[in-house]
């Protein structure tokens, strides 16, 4: 166990070498991406040793290196928490990043700033490591903000495109909302338990934890793109494909789920928060699965499937199974990163074409990418004995045992069948049928960087689930017998989704596409959410301020109150004065009659 700490720290601090090198001449060298990739591969190999040691001994460690400051009883120091979650997650993150870095060497080879791109990706990985291994809330917050800012920089990588800039801004703004919740939780823990260390927070008895846990749930909603704060994730697809593969599938977006997993000792006592988490996850997983059904951008379909899987992880936390949620995080990282890399390979080969309606018949020119995409899609749907099966099947089985939450299970099952449907749709549109793209495109996937990186993740997508699930601690549910129809539920709904998609595909091939239905519009326009949330408030505030400015100031004050009121007053007076017709005889006669009458009256009085 003596080597556990130094090896883990070596694996983490070795990643700083390429960042330090960025001030030297090596940073200007074209081999810099190669150095970064090699560093990450070495870090992965080193990190596997302490992980194996942890699996064999099961002994957690807390490494405190450097004390920073003390405020009353609050002690802030640089400390790393090496428990089950961090020791398993670090090799997974390093393995996936290693493959993505190698893929980036092929995908971004013509980019003039490729060295800076690799440095950004590496900085992102380091901040993710800080987040995962943090032992106190302050350190976790540094990692949390770090992944947020790196996400912003990498989504807006092609800053010449307006869409990329707005997408980056959208990501940072939605995450800001989540950060408010995080800071609120930090402040609550500081004032109530006077501690930011996880151990102290967990052992302190608290009366009512709803407020801090709500803050943490809001933070997770922002970072993990849950319903309400979800629109930034599909927009983030404006960034380069390696960014989508690393940040928006395998590592950064699971940070929110990871935060809730970290705080599971507080969550498991609080039924209110569990119910809220369950509701949020169930709504997200269904809504995003519905949205994925009709999208035409290949990356957006994969992005929505990511959001749907994140919803499934949140559901798992809601039924008080943090270890299962963590298992799904680890298994999901492999096949989702591979799906993004396959779509990146297709996009790059078809000269940056992302519309699946303009693809088709790619199984002949791109056999390796096709194989990987199909295996990745099957792993995503939870086909038996691929990686996704080990976590997804367990989650649905566990949910089956909770009869109180049957509605959440039902929604999750519908989302699972829809997962199979949109995966099949991608396979049909992209890989099978006749080519619908420009035949002049030079399709070539025989590049070692591309093949090796996808091959590694392909092996992970087949075997990783078995290896990780074999080492998961026993969950709170004891081994029990189960009727076979409950046991086969997950598989049954997945197969139903496949059959449904096959039927729909045949119908779509043979029938003419008429005017889109309202349901199609709802799915295609993302449930009208961006329109309502992004366009409507700004339009309403603009029209309201315009109306108040034009009506109140211009019309009422500057027109009616001062100039028009004076003119109206004078007009009334002048009309009264000048209301004479010029009939002199009549006036004279009336004057004479009045005079005569008054004289008669005066004389008669005398």
From Swiss-Prot:
Q: Which Pfam families match?
A: NADH5_C, Proton_antipo_M, Proton_antipo_N
Q: What's the superkingdom here?
A: Eukaryota
* Keyword terms of this UniProt record: Electron transport, Membrane, Mitochondrion, Mitochondrion inner membrane, NAD, Respiratory chain, Translocase, Transmembrane, Transmembrane helix, Transport, Ubiquinone
Catalytic activity, reaction form: a ubiquinone + NADH + 5 H(+)(in) = a ubiquinol + NAD(+) + 4 H(+)(out)
Localization terms from the record: Mitochondrion inner membrane
List the EC numbers from the record: 7.1.1.2
Query: GO:BP terms for this protein?
Result: electron transport coupled proton transport; mitochondrial electron transport, NADH to ubiquinone; mitochondrial respiratory chain complex I assembly
Q: Which InterPro entries match?
A: NADH_DH_su5_C, NADHpl_OxRdtase_5_subgr, ND/Mrp_TM, NU5C-like, Proton_antipo_N
Which segments cross the bilayer?
1-21, 43-63, 88-108, 117-137, 140-160, 171-191, 209-229, 241-261, 273-293, 310-330, 366-386, 413-433, 457-477, 488-508, 513-533, 582-602
Topology within the bilayer: Multi-pass membrane protein
GO cellular component term, pick one:
respiratory chain complex I
Quaternary structure, per UniProt, is: Core subunit of respiratory chain NADH dehydrogenase (Complex I) which is composed of 45 different subunits.
Similarity remark: Belongs to the complex I subunit 5 family.
Name of this chain's protein: NADH-ubiquinone oxidoreductase chain 5
The species this protein belongs to is: Felis catus
């Amino acid at each position: 166990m003596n080597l556990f700490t130094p090896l883990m720290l070596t694996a983490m601090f070795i990643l700083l070498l390429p960042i330090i090198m960025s001030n030297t001449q090596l940073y200007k060298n074209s081999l810099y991406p190669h150095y970064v990739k090699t560093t990450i591969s070495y870090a992965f190999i080193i990190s596997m040793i302490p992980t194996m040691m942890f699996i064999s001994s099961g002994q957690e460690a807390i490494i405190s290196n450097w004390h920073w400051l003390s405020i009353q009883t609050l002690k802030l120091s640089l400390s790393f928490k090496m428990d089950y979650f961090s020791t398993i997650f670090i090799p997974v993150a390093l393995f996936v990043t290693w493959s993505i870095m190698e893929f980036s060497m092929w995908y971004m080879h013509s980019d003039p700033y490729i060295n800076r791109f690799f440095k950004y990706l590496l900085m992102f990985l380091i901040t993710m490591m800080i987040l995962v291994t943090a032992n106190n809330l302050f350190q976790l917050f540094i990692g949390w903000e770090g992944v947020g800012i790196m996400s912003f920089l990498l989504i807006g990588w092609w800053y010449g495109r307006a869409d990329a800039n707005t997408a980056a801004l959208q990501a940072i703004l939605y995450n800001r909302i989540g950060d408010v919740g995080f800071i609120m939780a930090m402040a609550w823990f500081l004032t109530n338990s006077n501690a930011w260390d996880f151990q102290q927070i967990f052992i302190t008895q608290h009366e009512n934890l709803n407020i801090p846990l709500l803050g943490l749930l809001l933070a997770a909603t922002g970072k993990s793109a849950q319903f309400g704060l979800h629109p930034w994730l599909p927009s983030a697809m404006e960034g380069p494909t390696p960014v989508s593969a690393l940040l928006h599938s395998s590592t950064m977006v699971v940070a929110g789920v990871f935060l809730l997993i970290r705080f599971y000792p507080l969550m498991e006592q609080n039924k209110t928060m569990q119910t809220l988490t369950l509701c949020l996850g169930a709504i997200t997983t269904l809504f995003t699965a519905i949205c994925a059904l009709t999208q035409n951008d290949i990356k957006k379909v994969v992005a929505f499937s990511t959001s749907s899987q994140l919803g499934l992880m949140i559901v798992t936390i809601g039924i008080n199974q943090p270890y299962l949620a963590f298992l799904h995080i680890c298994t999901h990282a492999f096949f989702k990163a591979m799906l993004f890399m396959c779509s990146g390979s297709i996009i790059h080969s078809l000269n940056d074409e992302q519309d699946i309606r303009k693809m088709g018949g790619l199984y002949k020119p791109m056999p390796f990418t096709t194989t990987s995409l199909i295996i990745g899609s099957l792993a995503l749907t939870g086909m038996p004995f691929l990686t996704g099966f080990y976590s997804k099947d367990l989650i649905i089985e566990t949910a089956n045992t909770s009869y109180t939450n049957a509605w959440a299970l039902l929604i999750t099952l519908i989302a699972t069948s829809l997962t199979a449907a949109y995966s099949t749709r991608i396979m049909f549109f992209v890989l099978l049928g006749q080519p619908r793209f420009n035949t002049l495109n030079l399709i070539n996937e025989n590049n070692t960087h591309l093949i090796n990186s996808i091959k590694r993740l392909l092996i992970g997508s087949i075997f990783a689930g078995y290896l990780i699930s074999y080492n998961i601690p026993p969950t709170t549910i004891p081994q029990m017998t189960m009727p076979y129809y409950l046991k086969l539920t997950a598989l049954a709904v997945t197969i139903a989704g496949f059959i449904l998609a096959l039927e729909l595909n045949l119908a779509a091939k043979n029938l003419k596409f008429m005017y889109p239905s309202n349901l199609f519009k709802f799915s295609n326009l993302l449930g009208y959410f961006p329109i309502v949330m992004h366009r409507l408030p700004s339009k309403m505030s603009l029209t309201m301020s315009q109306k108040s400015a034009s009506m109140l100031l211009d019309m009422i004050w500057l027109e009616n109150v001062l100039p028009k009121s004076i003119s109206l007053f004078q007009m009334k007076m002048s009309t009264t004065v000048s209301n004479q017709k010029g009939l002199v005889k009549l006036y004279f006669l009336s004057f004479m009659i009045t005079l005569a009458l008054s004289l008669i009256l005066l004389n008669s009085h005398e």
